[in-house]
């Protein structure tokens, strides 16, 4: 399928954000009523389009990578920018998994007869129009678009300027595929100009939810400058607590994976807390494997005395490095580890390494994070690895959705009440009575 954009596509791209959002609000009910088969067919066509146009995608990404290199973009960001065969395979696998998942729409979570002939249902439905502002990751554009298609949501997408060429080609492939199978033309829109972010923030009449992905400063800016509900997370200051009852070999493998498997990810570990009773024996082993994997480390005064490294200031434990750097601190036990995590962490994903079930239970119940793990890498905090097909982001909020936000987090619900001429006055005057029977 050619990615050449038609006249309608180009005219949409030239419209104001306010006008686009208004059109998408009108298209939203039409997308919501599509069948799961129609939406799955659209996803299949998206996958086919991406594979058919992969050379154009890679060429565009090469331009973005060259520009980023010339601008001395940080290595952590450069890693996110790259879209190669591996990334293409990953997003296509994610689409396949999404297709295999059941329809998130029309699912009943309540069926109750209020009275004879008066029946209430609570049924899942799309949120409506969602604005997603994401960082310099072209694969995120594919994941987010796919999730919105499957969940029946219209999406306004604004990617980072660092991948403007890659995002343009990817979006043209996706939009053309979606329209060709009969989904509304205004199902998806790509915002390309920086000033369109502020225009989007003002579209509270037409946009139902914003999902920003980026720095803490950026997410706070979004929250402070819009009336639209915002879902998402800012930092990913993830922790691992090394308990005195941990399996050392298992622990070292997990720590290395959590730090180095994909350093630039928000679910990479940034701080390691070590029980003081095992510090003398464990820290030298840790230092050896970190050095072997080119990970530098900073530590609290007590840990630094053993490691012979830089001493950290207390406030530095808030730092999200997104790099091959690890903060290390000694703690007296699980309670102090929990206090540290709940204070310095970002409520993203935190892990305990221990073979003691009682200690693990305390940690799992008391750490106030979206993901709380035992004996596994924090890198598992991901929609694809959870079997969600993909994720629109990771939410550290406690309302609506928490953790990796897949299909379930992309829907809300409505109440459907079916009657036969029932009026409230009959119940207010005692002519009729509710009997509330769950069906």
What are the residue ranges of the model-derived segments?
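N-terminal Rossmann-like NAD(P)+-binding subdomain of aldehyde/semialdehyde dehydrogenases
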Residues: 2-120, 147
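ALDH superfamily catalytic-core signature
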Residues: 15-16, 135-139, 143-154, 169, ...
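Flexible, glycine/charged-enriched surface loops at secondary-structure junctions
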Residues: 36-40, 105, 181-188, 261-268, ...
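C-terminal core of ALDH-fold dehydrogenases
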Residues: 41, 339, 343-439
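Rossmann-like NAD(P) dinucleotide-binding subdomain of oxidoreductase/dehydrogenase enzymes
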Residues: 100, 109-249
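Short beta-strand-to-turn element immediately C-terminal to the catalytic PLP-Schiff-base lysine
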Residues: 241-244, 273-276, 331, 353-355, ...
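Short, well-ordered beta-strand elements within core beta-sheets of diverse protein domains
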Residues: 27-33, 272-274, 323-332, 347-352
């Amino acid at each position: 399928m050619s990615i050449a954009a038609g006249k309608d596509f180009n005219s949409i791209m030239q419209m104001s954000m306010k006008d686009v959002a208004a059109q998408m609000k009108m298209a939203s009910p039409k997308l919501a009523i599509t069948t799961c088969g129609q939406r799955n067919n659209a996803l299949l066509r998206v996958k086919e389009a991406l594979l058919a146009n992969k050379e154009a995608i890679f060429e565009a990404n090469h331009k973005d990578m060259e520009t980023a290199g010339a601008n001395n973009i940080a290595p952590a960001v450069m890693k996110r920018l790259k879209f190669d065969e591996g990334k293409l395979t990953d997003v296509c696998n994610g689409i396949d998994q999404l297709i295999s998942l059941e329809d998130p729409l029309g699912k009943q979570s309540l069926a109750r007869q209020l009275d004879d002939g008066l029946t209430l249902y609570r049924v899942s439905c799309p949120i409506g129009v969602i604005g997603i502002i994401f960082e310099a990751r072209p694969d995120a554009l594919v994941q987010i678009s796919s999730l919105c298609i499957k969940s029946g949501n219209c999406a306004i997408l604004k990617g980072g300027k660092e991948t403007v060429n890659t995002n343009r080609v990817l979006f043209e492939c996706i939009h053309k595929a979606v329209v060709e199978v009969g989904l509304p033309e205004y199902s998806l829109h790509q915002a390309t100009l920086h000033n369109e972010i502020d225009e989007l923030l003002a579209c509270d009449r037409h946009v139902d939810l914003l999902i920003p992905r980026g720095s803490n400063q950026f997410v706070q800016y979004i929250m402070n400058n819009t009336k639209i509900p915002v879902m998402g997370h800012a930092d990913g200051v993830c922790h691992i607590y090394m308990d005195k009852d941990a399996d050392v070999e298992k622990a070292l493998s997990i720590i290395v994976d959590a730090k180095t498997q994909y350093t630039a990810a928000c679910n990479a570990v940034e701080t390691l807390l070590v029980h003081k009773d095992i510090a003398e024996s464990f820290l030298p082993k840790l230092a050896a494997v970190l050095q072997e994997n080119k990970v530098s480390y900073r530590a609290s005064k007590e840990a630094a005395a053993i490691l012979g490294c830089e001493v950290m200031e207390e406030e530095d434990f808030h730092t999200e490095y997104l790099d091959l750097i690890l903060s290390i601190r000694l703690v007296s036990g699980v309670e102090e580890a929990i206090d540290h995590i709940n204070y310095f962490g970002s409520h993203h994903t935190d892990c305990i390494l221990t073979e003691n079930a009682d200690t693990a239970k305390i940690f799992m119940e008391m750490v106030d994070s979206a993901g709380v793990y035992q004996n596994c890498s924090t890198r598992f905090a991901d929609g694809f690895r959870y079997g969600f097909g993909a994720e629109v982001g990771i939410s550290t909020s406690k309302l609506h959705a928490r953790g990796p936000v897949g299909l379930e987090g992309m829907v809300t619900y409505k109440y459907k009440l079916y009657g036969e001429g029932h009026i409230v006055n009959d119940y207010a005057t005692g002519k009729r009575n509710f009997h509330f029977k769950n069906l």
